[in-house]
Amino acid sequence: MANYEFSQVSGDRPGCRLSRKAQIGLGVGLLVLIALVVGIVVILLRPRSLLVWTGEPTTKHFSDIFLGRCLIYTQILRPEMRDQNCQEILSTFKGAFVSKNPCNITREDYAPLVKLVTQTIPCNKTLFWSKSKHLAHQYTWIQGKMFTLEDTLLGYIADDLRWCGDPSTSDMNYVSCPHWSENCPNNPITVFWKVISQKFAEDACGVVQVMLNGSLREPFYKNSTFGSVEVFSLDPNKVHKLQAWVMHDIEGASSNACSSSSLNELKMIVQKRNMIFACVDNYRPARFLQCVKNPEHPSCRLNT
């Protein structure tokens, strides 16, 4: 038998060892991969810039003001609505425009809000206005039984506030919001007022009133909210008469009255929709409010 010599074998199995050059290359590749992943994470987590607009931003402390007005209205002014959930109303309101491009808001975005907040206005108690907001609000406040849109819950809450969102954040935009002149008609404020104005008109019944500014060249302005939305949203099956109160500034010129071409245009629209139209120049109860600041004016004399 042949004699064989066996050499001692190490306990470790022989393996394929990378060259130093390959190890360096692998390390560099791993570092590049880590850097790439970190870079992507940083980009994704970095706050994106807000869209820049020329209009005023969301009103400061918006949510606090919203909730405060809601509570005042439901708990003090109209306690019959005390069961309304103000937090839910705020959340639903924000859901219409937060995290969205403020120029792409639709009527459907506010549909959940309109469905959530229901309010019944008594027949014969609806007062629309156009270019006469201050006097109309004075009148309903003193009269106590009539409602402008801003005397309803949603109108009261949103009156004179500004708001918008941005696609890059779940918060409201407190830096800037679109101005109506920026070719942005579908902004959250404009769409909101159109939606609730339409609902306000659709719900009206009996005899309705509109207060117009007779000191303007066109007391009835077709492009106003009343002229483009509300008058066409009245339901002739529920509203049988519209009365226009054409109010002139006491110190201004009374260049337009119920016989003007502007009011005749409104009359034609109303009558074509099978409703009765009536017009009063300087409706006396509202005139008295104007006379509070100008008691000596000739038009404020009792025999005038």
From Swiss-Prot:
Gene Ontology CC terms: cell surface; membrane; plasma membrane
- Keywords in alphabetical order: Disulfide bond, Glycoprotein, Hydrolase, Membrane, NAD, NADP, Signal-anchor, Transferase, Transmembrane, Transmembrane helix
* Family of this protein: Belongs to the ADP-ribosyl cyclase family.
Can you list the disulfide-bonded cysteine pairs? 70-86, 103-184, 164-177, 258-279, 291-300
Q: In its keyword annotation, does this UniProt entry include Hydrolase?
A: yes
Per the UniProt topology annotation, the Cytoplasmic ranges are 1-21
**Phenotypic consequence of gene deletion:** Loss of cADPR and NAADP synthesis.
Q: What sections of the protein cross the membrane?
A: 22-44
Extracellular compartment segments: 45-304
Q: GO: which molecular function terms?
A: hydrolase activity, acting on glycosyl bonds; identical protein binding; NAD+ nucleosidase activity, cyclic ADP-ribose generating; phosphorus-oxygen lyase activity; transferase activity
Q: What is this protein called?
A: ADP-ribosyl cyclase/cyclic ADP-ribose hydrolase 1
Which InterPro entries has this protein been placed in? ADP-ribosyl_cyclase (IPR003193)
Q: Which reaction does it catalyse?
A: NAD(+) = cyclic ADP-beta-D-ribose + nicotinamide + H(+); nicotinate + NADP(+) = nicotinate-adenine dinucleotide phosphate + nicotinamide; NAD(+) + H2O = ADP-D-ribose + nicotinamide + H(+)
Q: SUPFAM superfamilies from the xrefs?
A: N-(deoxy)ribosyltransferase-like (SSF52309)
Entry annotated with the keyword Protease = no
Where in the sequence does glycosylation occur per the annotation?
104, 124, 213, 223
Q: Where is the signal peptide?
A: none
Q: How does it assemble?
A: Homodimer.
Instruction: Write out the function statement from the record.
Output: Synthesizes the second messengers cyclic ADP-ribose (cADPR) and nicotinate-adenine dinucleotide phosphate (NAADP), the former a second messenger for glucose-induced insulin secretion, the latter a Ca(2+) mobilizer. Also has cADPR hydrolase activity.
Which residues catalyse the reaction? 123, 205
Q: Where in the cell is it found?
A: Membrane
Query: Could you tell me which species this protein originates from?
Result: Mus musculus
